[in-house]
Amino acid sequence: MTESTYNGYRRIDFTFQGREAVLVFPKEENKTTKWMIKTEYFNAFPELEIAMLGRGYHLAYLKNNNRWGTEDDATAKRDFSEYLQAEYGLDRRCVCIGMSCGGWEAVAFASLYPSYISLLYLDAPLLSFFGLCEPYRTDWIEEHKKARGYATAGERFVDNDLPIHRLGTLTDNRLPVALVYGGADKVVDPILNAEALLDWYKLHNAPIKVWYKPECDHHPHVAVNLEEVMDYIAENEI
């Protein structure tokens, strides 16, 4: 275990089940037992995580074997959650923060283990392979095949066990969502991902709030009123 700082907060790095793990602690004066997990891209666009540390949340991260929502990664997050409960007294449920492919990971985790989730923050989430604006990029095809065991590129589009197919578990369990996305996203199609999620949640009268950035491309993530986002999280997490 090594100790350092993360934007002024105490950070520990350690190994959990052979994976890189991180836990960042809030200041003692406003520390709570609440916590959030960043599902992918730990150091990218950290504005929300830093702001929530300021509200007393812990920040956790566990390295994935891949970015594509395989069951081994979701199960490792469940085990990691139980470890953080036992070792540090954190709550059973966490805020799950997923940006881009991290949104895929977040929905995969939440759909398999909904009782470990208090709320999902999804920022330009990718929920299916057909939701990519360039699904036939060679590097992506090879990454997808390796992660999920596909023999061909076309297999990706007939797989019916992707995050987009698991939204029913989220709404059945009334898991709240804070959704942020840009209308000019050229990486993750907003209609086939964020808006499909929004339509599903509306159809099932499930709790969701949207921050829409009409001129925003895939990046930057966040770039919205963080106080509004954090207030929504505080008022709606279960």
What spans do the regions from the language model cover?
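N-terminal cap/lid segment of alpha/beta-hydrolase-fold proteins
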Residues: M1-K31
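C-terminal catalytic histidine-bearing segment of alpha/beta-hydrolase fold enzymes
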Residues: V24, I191-I238
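Short beta-strand element of the alpha/beta-hydrolase
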Residues: K31-Y41
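Alpha/beta-hydrolase active-site loop
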Residues: W68-G89, A108
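Alpha/beta-hydrolase fold nucleophile elbow
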Residues: Y88-S100
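Glycine-rich nucleophile elbow surrounding the catalytic serine of serine-hydrolase chemistry
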Residues: G98-A108
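Hydrolase active-site cap/lid region
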Residues: A108-G154
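The feature captures the conserved acid-bearing segment of alpha/beta-hydrolase catalytic domains
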Residues: E134-T138, E142-K202
